[in-house]
Amino acid sequence: GLTVGKSLVEDEMMPTALVIVNMAEDAGVQLLLPTDHQVVDSYDPLNSRKTIPVEFTNTGLVGLDIGVETSARFAQALEGAKTIIWNGPMGMFEEKPFDEGTIAVAKAVA
């Protein structure tokens, strides 16, 4: 229900995402979603970046990584985990500095 600006969205996966959200809610499982992210005004990582809460994303911004608050929340949730299934990076990890979220979560897993 939030605006994601120019960020990549796989529209065909929206029904699946809603099923997952509902399943987690029905099972009483906490589903952690990002609360902040690093954004730029285009896909050019050399543009000035800023970290903003996800609810303030506007149509002109592109989210390229999770923010520091989200990285910390995810790391805390991983403490003491016995099994972790990880599918994909937290952001555009191929380009610095948008690899920071993925690195932070990887360190928490290690």
What annotation goes with each model-predicted range?
Residues 1-110:
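Active-site loop-to-helix "anion-binding N-cap" substructures in soluble metabolic enzymes
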